[in-house]
Amino acid sequence: IVNDMSELDVDGVLIANTEIVDAASNNFVSISADSISSRSGIQKLDSALKNLLEKRSPDFILLETSGSSHPLPLVRYLREHPQVSLKAFLSLVDTVMLNDDYDGGKKLIPVFQEHLNRGTRGVESLLAEQIMFCNKLLLTKNDRLPFYVVTEVARAIHPLNP
């Protein structure tokens, strides 16, 4: 299941044109023009899962969300779903962005805490939550930074998900 916030459904089109998945085999669903973590997105996810599980009994289902998806509504939904069980929650985090925009990742937690104290939400809230609620975290774009910088970024965000 692929989620793309855009109506263009770029991710869905790219994945649908592979040898591994296709809609005709009932092993692929794309949910576009909505956030899968929103109320309407959860309804679309529910429908997609029903369609997938009607004709198949897959060993696993991979759910690829938009980068702007909030993890907690998805975790709650999947935890309560009668036919599936959540085994892993993987977050991909852009190491270059953390390095450039958050001083090697060191400013992410203080800015997130500032939002919590003010009762506001910012992109830092979403980013911190995506790190906090995952059980697997991959730092991406590591090839663009020296190894020691990637290590420093990893150390800086580690308190969010020890």
Predicted regions and their residues:
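G-domain G4 guanine-recognition motif of GTPases
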Residues: 64-66, 92-97, 134-150
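A short helix->loop->beta-strand "cap" motif at the edges of active sites that frequently abuts
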Residues: 87, 161-162
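GTPase G-domain guanine-specificity segment
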Residues: 14, 103, 141-161
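Structured helix-beta-strand junction loops
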Residues: 133-134, 160
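Nucleotide-state-sensitive switch-loop elements of NTP-binding domains
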Residues: 1-120, 125
